[in-house]
Amino acid sequence: MPTLKTFGIILLFWVHLMSAQQLRVTILVEPSVTARDSGLNVFIAGNRSEFGKWNPSSIRLERISDSLWKFESNFDTLSFLEFKITAGSWEQEALFDSNKSPTNTTLQVTKDTTLIIRPLFWKRRILQQKPEPMIRGKVDYHRQLGGDGLNHNRDIIVWLPPSYEKNTKKHYPVLYMHDGQNIFDPTTAFTGYDWRVDEVADSLIRMKVIEEIIIVGIYNSPDRLPEYSDSELGSAYMNFVINVVKALVDSTYRTKQSKEHTGIIGSSLGGLSSLLFVWKRPDVFGMAGCLSPSFWYDDEKTLKEIREYSGHKKHIKIYLDCGGREKELISGYKRMVEILKTKGYKKGKDLDYTFESNGTHSEHYWAKRVWRPLVFMFGRR
């Protein structure tokens, strides 16, 4: 007679078998504006390597006809998929409403599935002219900055706090942010949604929740992936931020230059990069905000490095978060929290973290919770 233990073994085997099963996902795209009309090809960009890891021009769909494109691939059962359709760049994203960019399409793979996507517009078709920036407060632009070892120049945008021009004797802490085109202005944000950091910071400052800060957005480049990782280009990017961007900001604006008044924030690979900045250069950066950090990247290299670190505790503050619908990131987020605890970091003191159960990997959700690292880093004491 089968025992309870036997049933348990059978159940575990069944769960393992289900998780290892490969299921077929087919995505059909039928745009209203056809290739014959627009001269465009169709691409998919998303959270999986099969989707090109959010590269908008990496994975071209198979063209079946002038009005139909197809993507097919196998995925493990229960895989969480998140993607968008483009015509080769984020400036040519597929739209379903002429007034705004769509949120990511998501799918949990539980069976062989066919999705039909019917875009009504391509973004560049409805942008007849470049829209005016939509930013609260005063900003300065510094164009085409370059650094040793980097392949691309980039812009930075500097947001100044409300009292900056009136209180000419005051000096301010500085927050640096990766993916700078996405943080203030929806007209430059790659999905059409920005983080609204200008509005959030302005409100928190006027409510006297945080101290006044200068915010520096550093635009990304086509080398975003290696620049935001622990690599040769990543080291060159870090040196660029310190020796070019920070040097320019400190010489141009009234800043508090010490590490205690210098923070850095990013999301996804930018979240990974932010942790690398404070961990490798705690003499320069005293605070890091890591939203939806990609600790899985490069075979979890950063997780391993910090877990194996045996030196003195670094005097830094770290904020981490993750969304419940970011399946590939949850494990790394939770393990990093526990690793930092074992290194002596304490919640509410030099460590803070939050888990948003419905959060997805998108600017929309990062905008909703960016107030948390701002308060943790720059809250009035």
Q: Across the structure, where does each feature detected by a protein language model lie?
A:
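C-terminal catalytic histidine-bearing segment of alpha/beta-hydrolase fold enzymes
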Residues: 321, 326-381
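Aromatic-rich carbohydrate-binding modules that target alpha-glucans
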Residues: 33-78, 88-109
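Exposed beta-strand face motif in extracellular beta-rich ectodomains
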Residues: 79-83
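Primarily recognizes the serine-hydrolase "nucleophile elbow" in alpha/beta-hydrolase
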Residues: 258-305, 311
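Active-site machinery of serine-nucleophile hydrolases
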Residues: 181-239
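Gly/Ser-rich "nucleophile elbow"/oxyanion-hole loop immediately N-terminal to the catalytic nucleophile
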Residues: 165, 226-268
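A domain-start/cap signature at the N-terminus of enzymes
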Residues: 101-171
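Bacterial Sec-dependent N-terminal signal peptides
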Residues: 1-26
